[in-house]
Amino acid sequence: QVRGINFMIPHSFNPKSPYDRDYPPYFYNDGHEPRFPLYKVWADYTSRLSLMLTGGKHVCPVAILFSGNARRVGEYVTPEDMTTVLQDALYDCDWLPFEAFVSDASIEGNKLSLHEENYKVLIVPPTEVIPYETLAKVKEFFDAGGTVVGYGRLPSKSATVGKSSSEIVNLRNAIWGTNPEISNKACKTSTASGRSYFLPEKPDVKTITAAIKEDASIPPVIEVLEGETNNWLHVLHRVKDGKDVFFICNQDH
């Protein structure tokens, strides 16, 4: 639930229990499930969390651009690994579809707004092919003072009819510069103090922290002032009725 789930639906009920070997049932299991007496404890706990984590306003600093179709037309890396390392570094993030980014998101200075969400960092996925209008809006955000992060590879081909790959390369170079090197320091800055970064395909917590927190001066959702978390601490932040609600979870299983 620390990753954003706020409505739990139990499943795996099986009328053939306990004799179905293909899909063995859980929960009651005709009285054969020894953990069932504790199910109410778990269900009550998740119900309380669902109530606390529903409504209000989600506070999230990072948006990851995402496309389910980009991998069909060229090299593409899905955002799961980047999502995990961001959360390990105590940065919450949302996946933002290309289409929603272009049509619904607005740029307000160095922030990207979508409905009630406000993002300070925009991450462009490692993709070979990208729609022209998507990358053009990334450049607009960078020019307005936003922080843009690429990793692994930068786009080089157009997914838009009538727009050439050279036009994509021109936009890419305007954001990250020509032949940027992988570094936790900014590749390029805009006149409005926008910053662009090019990180490795699988960055670690140290790299994320060095680039986003230390170089771009964008703090994580919370900071651990004393002790070691071994990168297992994840956090979700909402504002409800004018009060901050933080759900802090130890993911070390």
Predicted regions and their residues:
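Carbohydrate-binding surfaces of carbohydrate-active enzymes
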Residues: 1-253
